[in-house]
Amino acid sequence: MNIQTQAFIAVTAQPIPYYADTTAIFNTLCQSNSNSLLLDSAEIGSKNSLQSLILVNAAVKITCLGHNVTFKALNNNGKQVLKEIHPKLTALGKVSAVNFEDEFSVQFLPLDNQLDEDSKLQSATIFDGLRVISSLYQHSQTPIFLGGLFAYDLVANFIPMDGITLKNDGINCPDYSFYLAEHLITIDHQNQQATLKSFCFAQEEQVNIAKTSLSIAQKLKNIDHVLSIKAASDEVKTNFDDPEFTGIVKALKHHINIGDVFQIVPSRRFSLACPNTLASYAQLKQNNPSPYMFYMNDEDFILFGASPESALKYAPENRQLEIYPIAGSRPRGFDAHGNIDPELDARLELELRLDHKEQAEHLMLVDLARNDIARVCQSGTRKVAELMQVDRYSHIMHLVSRVVGKLRPELDALHAYQACMNMGTLTGAPKIKAMQLIYQFEQQKRHSYGGAVGYLTSDGHFDTCIVIRSAFVQNGMAHVQAGCGEVLDSDPQMEADETRHKAAAVLKAIRQVNTQAK
């Protein structure tokens, strides 16, 4: 689908004072606002901060659940956007509303699983909920910004789920939730520069938008660095204890033996009280700086994390699509005092590099990434740009690779995400069968875990990370999920231990904060 219609937009950009502490900025501007988002990034080697994006407030919230996409205007600015997109969406699905000016929903038809891959990509789908808005403002010299979450379970709308029933675990997460930015702060930490951008979609709202920009600039003169902390229990519970989880690993090994899959990623969930979400994110960020760090303040949940792994990245200037598979891990080499022992750390890296099981698992997933890239990229452009490097984080080290290709001209980044979700490092291979088996054995939704957080702009840029090393917080409880890459010769207890190692950094950060106030 190609939507060329233009709509009014006025964008202003003004320099603002640089502050390194983005958590304090978010606390000052957004802590009382739902529908706000903080994206931070750090360099893998040096751990130095690179860039940050703060979606201070939004004009429209776009939420998907099943085959229904809901568009909610959050103010008068957003109402104009709904007015613009409504007629375009009526051509794509069944539209319903009590008051079309404030909120409406679009029901898309389920895709026929008998269609070939290209026909599925060219059909109207729930991704058009985002595509319509992005396309409407593609003429804007300063691109609009859509930031948010694709849940893991979004994929259930696109794969056969016959005979699969999932238990209600009491957690509610939309299939996707995105915000159309009204005010966006961009921070370049390397050059110590910051800019406040405002996006006005309704001509009559320009004065109000300017007033809000002035108010934001004034608040930045008195940044609140103090995060309120409440005492809470540091007790951690899990949905599968070690015997239960190793039992799942053993049962899945049967499916590897009979050839259903040759690699799969079972997971389990660790839960604990988390009344101090922003402070926990700040602690995690301090303990474990990562390429992708995020704090999403939704009306219905809070999601924060420090992910090492890109989900899908797209640059329109050269049409390069990129997947960054991470598979194979070892704990960091700590001494008896909890400090990194360089010699032990180096030995563990060598052990990781020489482990045949880890090599096999990693190469399977590199091959799966190559297949995903090939599905949507031009023939002959796919290549493995980096192979089996080692990235280090606070508690764990990983084998990583980078696979790239040139996206076909008739497709965009949302088509690519539809074709590639969910990332193979969180599912296994063959991917569809692995995802079906995961649902059968875990028997519940994964919610945010294994999905993607990031952003889409109207000029086509798309940058997302896999939601791992993260906490989904709802009703005061944080849910931290972690998986393991299982192959034929996997040791069940080692796989259970791997999930604990992967969850450790987030659990530690939350527990540190919970006990600070005691």
Swiss-Prot record:
Database matches in InterPro entries: ADC_synthase, Anth_synth_I-like, Anth_synth_I_N, Anth_synth_I_TrpE, Chorismate_C
Pathway: Amino-acid biosynthesis; L-tryptophan biosynthesis; L-tryptophan from chorismate: step 1/5
Positions that bind chorismate: G328, S329, Y449, R469, G483, C484, G485
Superkingdom of origin organism: Bacteria
Binding-site residues for Mg(2+), renumbered to this chain: E361, E498
GO molecular function: anthranilate synthase activity; metal ion binding
Keyword Metal-binding annotated: yes
GO biological process assignments: L-tryptophan biosynthetic process
UniProt keyword terms in alphabetical order: Amino-acid biosynthesis, Aromatic amino acid biosynthesis, Lyase, Magnesium, Metal-binding, Tryptophan biosynthesis
Documented activity regulation: Feedback inhibited by tryptophan.
EC number(s) from the headed UniProt entry: 4.1.3.27
Binding site for L-tryptophan: S41, P291, Y292, M293
Known catalytic reactions: chorismate + L-glutamine = anthranilate + pyruvate + L-glutamate + H(+)
Cofactor(s) essential for the protein: Mg(2+)
Cofactor detail note: Binds 1 Mg(2+) ion per subunit.
Family membership: Belongs to the anthranilate synthase component I family.
NCBIfam families given in the database record: PRK13564.1, trpE_proteo
Oligomer status and interactors: Heterotetramer consisting of two non-identical subunits: a beta subunit (TrpG) and a large alpha subunit (TrpE).
Functional description taken from the UniProt entry: Part of a heterotetrameric complex that catalyzes the two-step biosynthesis of anthranilate, an intermediate in the biosynthesis of L-tryptophan. In the first step, the glutamine-binding beta subunit (TrpG) of anthranilate synthase (AS) provides the glutamine amidotransferase activity which generates ammonia as a substrate that, along with chorismate, is used in the second step, catalyzed by the large alpha subunit of AS (TrpE) to produce anthranilate. In the absence of TrpG, TrpE can synthesize anthranilate directly from chorismate and high concentrations of ammonia.
Protein name: Anthranilate synthase component 1
Gene from which the chain derives: trpE
